[in-house]
Amino acid sequence: MKTLLLTLVVVTTVCLDLGYTRRCFNQQSSQPKTTKSCPLGENSCYNKQWRDHRGSITERGCGCPKVKPGIKLRCCESEDCNN
């Protein structure tokens, strides 16, 4: 009986996703697409754009950061929504 109970606990732990994490794109500007799993509890992704001497720059990642005036920011809350 103890063996059966232990087996059920192990199977339940392995099969259940006990910590869901958001996945966001994190490539910069025109780099090839890459994604990353966000820290536990971080439920949003961002796409930040600005211009400088190099041209148009895009930064992507987890969260929704505060930005300075003149920087475009788009935050979203679904998988891979920040491309």
Swiss-Prot record:
Keywords from the UniProt entry: Acetylcholine receptor inhibiting toxin, Disulfide bond, Ion channel impairing toxin, Neurotoxin, Postsynaptic neurotoxin, Secreted, Signal, Toxin
Matches recorded under InterPro entries: Snake_3FTx, Snake_toxin-like_sf, Snake_toxin_con_site, Toxin_cobra-type
Tissue: Expressed by the venom gland.
Major localisation: secreted
Subcellular location: Secreted
Record's signal peptide: 1-21
Covalent S-S links between cysteines: C24-C45, C38-C62, C64-C75, C76-C81
A single Gene Ontology CC term: extracellular region
GO molecular-function term, one example from the UniProt record: ion channel regulator activity
Family affiliation: Belongs to the three-finger toxin family. Short-chain subfamily. Type I alpha-neurotoxin sub-subfamily.
Function: Binds to muscle nicotinic acetylcholine receptor (nAChR) and inhibit acetylcholine from binding to the receptor, thereby impairing neuromuscular transmission.
Protein name (record): Short neurotoxin NCA-04
Species name: Laticauda colubrina (Yellow-lipped sea krait)
